[in-house]
Amino acid sequence: MAQIDDFKANLIGGGARANQYRVTVTPPPGIAIGLDVRRASFLVTASQLPASTLGEIAVPFRGRNIYVSGDRPPPETWTVTFMNDTDFMIRNAMERWQNGINNFAENTGAISPADYQTDLTVEQLDRDDTILKSYIFRAAYPLTVGAIELTNAEATEIETFEVTWRYQHFEPSGVV
């Protein structure tokens, strides 16, 4: 029968903590958005490490199916929640980015994906800021800049908003 000491001996490092992470948003090369990358990283309040999914193919054989792996489906979107400061620096940057892709008023914008897509990173950290695991989201751009709720009922909370990113694929560390 397993003992508590056996369990503790197998929890190397004490377990990864959900609140120890860093998100880095790199501005796109072709659109000036005015983002302070270091400050934006501090104002992230929530994110997630991505799921990994493989497709499957059912192969019928004498009334039953066997399954073999298929292609990867298109990736899910990735969402980051930011605190909103009184200068609206991050929100303004995200709106400038979207406006550079497709202008709010004129339906014009960047043509080449190389101008508006960039790489984003999320890193799982140890309690001493050592990077335990990282994911690079390749060729990403802000798909949705979420609403900010305004209400009289929340006098003691700082505004937050979500940005949902579309990316082409992600690259996890420690896999290859």
Residues of each region from the PLM?
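Glycine-rich, low-complexity intrinsically disordered segments
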Residues: M1-V176
